[in-house]
Amino acid sequence: MKKHIAAGWRYVRYGRIVLGWIVMSTFLLGFLGVVNASALARWQLLPALLAGNVLAVTVLVLLTLCFGRVYCSVLCPLGLWQDFVSYLAERRKGGRRRYAYRQESWKLRYGVLAVLASGLLGGAAAIPLLLDPYTIFGRIATHLFAPAIHSGANQLIRWQIAYDGPDLGLAHTDVVTFGTTAVLVAAAYLIVISLVAWRYGRLYCQAFCPVGTLLGTVSRHAVLQLHFGTDCISCGLCAKSCPSSCIDVPHHRIDASRCIDCFTCVSVCPKGALAFGRPSKETITTSNAGSTQNLPNASRQPGESDNPNQPNAAPSLTRRQMIAGSALATLAAAGALTKGARGTALAAAPEKVVRPPGALSYATFSERCTGCHLCVASCPQGILRPANLEYGLGGIFQPRLDFTDGYCDPACTRCSDICPAGAITPVAPEKKKTLKIGTALYRPDTCVILTEGRTCGHCAEVCPIHAIEMADDGNGHLLPKVHHRRCIGYGSCEYHCPAQPKAIRVAGKEEQTIVQTNGQFGRGKK
């Protein structure tokens, strides 16, 4: 009977793994530009909080209250990546389990959460940019995985052509990189998190991830939890298989705030002594207070192991610590919600930086954007770039428009359609054609008409809004004249300008507004 129970939980575990692979693959394909992963991205906790996505936040909290940290188990792409690395490590070690119980790093966990809360409440946009797990995975996928996969696919196409191989159904894709800084930072995150996962499993999730701590605080009160039964023989297989290192076998205690419901422990238990359900009051007391009731050598002192080689387990959190942690988690969540709602920033918009169409207010954009780079990876024109210090230190890695290699198509609304945090609000195609995101500024000192005596007028020819005309300067030269009120700033003029440095450049606006085009909209020349 016990073997049947273990086998049943093994299928549950496999189902969790399959679902996790589907989620991570969908995210990866989304950052590759193959599928639209925006619907799934909107269920990521911190972006949902910043966007004021009440439905997503409510569902995630209720799921956690009912079942524990299932979000971390099947919805968080960074957590799923750590599971993959842990699996590779186990195969490398011949399938040998290598985990051991670790005491909760309460001060570290809630210290990181306090940093996030202070950043959200204080307007320090760089804090969520650096700490959100979904955002970290997004940058890794955009700047490391996507270029590597595209390069590999292009190489397969070259081999197919060279050796007259079968048609693989692949199309050549330009490999786009978005700057050395973004690549190096993404690589640093990938290396550190992967090394930690290789050796310690989900240690990052249990000690450093603020989303994990936030949900872990809720998970302490989950209705259904993993708990010990009366048939435990203290073999320790469950603790050795737990990637969260949250199972204290000598004290028959499972830390619900760190358990991610992977169900590995239940599937390996030879006696079926672990159960997932509503624990009894006695079990809750044992879990929360470190009681030795129903344990071997029940006369020992709390926190003392019957194995002399086993370090003494730390007592569980005091009531005061639990209240303080819950208050801090509530403060962080409230900070994210109010930050996304109020749309105020500490500084004015940086001059000349052009934001994506739909980032109507610089204040709202800077406070909601987590820099996940889903828009950067999905831009068909490839003109969205992660900022370095163009927005200041607080806006590092937030997207900006760069017209060096292209211009913004007035008919394209991809970035506003997929933003999960509400930093780029949805813009209808017809509305976008009149949405002013910047203004073209003409610099005659670098214009080839004056510096080289050439006949030019590319900027006027390609302007889709006909906001540039060629006018006589009184000296026999036809020079560009920009009608600033009509210009919408989509960069076609800057991209096509032959001068170096550019004689016409687009400067961004603090507030994106609708302009009157008088029905003169046209695509202009390519």
Where do the protein language model's features map onto the residues?
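Non-ligating segments of multi-cofactor redox enzymes
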Residues: 1-252, 257-258, 263-526
